[in-house]
Amino acid sequence: METTPKKKNSLKHVLFGSLIGTTIEFFDFYIYANAAVLVFPQLFFPGSNSTIATLESLATFSIAFLSRPLGSAFFGHYGDKIGRKFTLVAALLTMGISTVTIGFLPSYASIGVAAPLLLMLCRFGQGVGLGGEWGGAVLLAIENAPPNKRAWYGMFPQLGAPIGLLLSGGTFLFLTDSMSNEDFMDYGWRIPFIASSLLVVIGFYIRTKITETPSFENSKKEQEEVNVPFLTLVKSYKNQLIFGTFAAVTTFLVFYLMTVFTLSWATSDLGIVKRDGLLIQLFSVLFFAIFIPVSAVVADKIGRRKMLIIATVAIAIFGFFFSYFLSSGNIVLVTTFACIGMALMGFTYGPLGTFLSELFPTNVRYSGASLTFNMAGILGAAFAPMIAIWLASTYSVSYVGLYLTIAACISLFAFLVISKEEHRF
């Protein structure tokens, strides 16, 4: 009786279980991001000029960020009440079904205005699923971690972001290289959405093999049960919610400026062909992946808060260089820009999950960490690509950099107000 849980909660099982789910979730999320720039403006929003169509497409992209806090509240409630395992499986299925459905949607030419409406509904479902996935995956890792390695364990689910992005970008690159533009726009773009069902099956199988974390089991035995975790958060952990949210804003903004905005601006305004734009993105993501574990190691040595403050200051400075890198179609400058931005993203993203989770006790941690992370997504990412494109088109790309610098200053203030990690384990 005692050996089975220990076997299932081995280091390999825990870390791979936390990584595979976020990889699948972010793959699903990013294939939508690529399609929102490369495909959806023509298929779901015809009749407008290219800039307006792109903005309309990116508006559907933002819907997921608005629905993610709903997923956080819903799945967080059950994750704190009945356990991490069941909730992680349910969140994965919600995201997966929504993504696969997009692959079967007819275009505007076939069913008219119903097409973008159905697209928005599926995007809403993606957001709900991801809102419940991230927090649970992080907790699966850090609630099984020794105290001196929480950032290291917590970075494994964070690695799902660059891996998912590499898979999605690589898939789109392969498809655009292997078929004509007409075939790609006709049916090729659907392949990644439908094929994601295979990844969901793998993730579902692995998640069903995971047992509850020791922290959750101890919490059920030793603490009073919280009837409504969300209400407890608002009543007793309001400061952690507010300042944790603002602390994470810059992480979201820098990422979506480096991916969605940079890909859109480079291919539509700087004259870089789509294939080269995708190659730049894929290459820069390697820096994202490399610096996630680097930042986790540093964070375990000097503290999560201190590591995040250093990264945020660097991002604020980086904002002043947008004009230098993005004022021309020089592919070397654009690539350098993307690589620096993604490296900074790795520095801030690696320890973030651990930092946010340590702000809350076990019985509301799923809800608390998920809500702070996903509310930051609304503020930092929901409308970021649209705002950035508008700023760059109306004024110049230097204003996009200023946008990032201002956000970084807000996050820096939040980190300074949060005086120390609370380690509520």
Model-based region annotation:
Residues 72-84, 292-304:
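Helix-to-loop junctions at the C-terminal end of transmembrane segments
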Residues 203-210, 407-425:
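Multi-pass alpha-helical transporter architecture, strongest
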Residues 33, 238-287, 381:
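Extracytoplasmic gate region of multi-pass secondary transporters
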Residues 306-351:
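C-terminal transmembrane helical hairpin of 12-TM major facilitator-type secondary transporters
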Residues 152-176, 373-384:
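Glycine-rich segments within core transmembrane alpha-helices of 12-TM secondary carriers
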Residues 36-68:
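Extracellular/periplasmic helix-loop-helix junction of adjacent transmembrane segments
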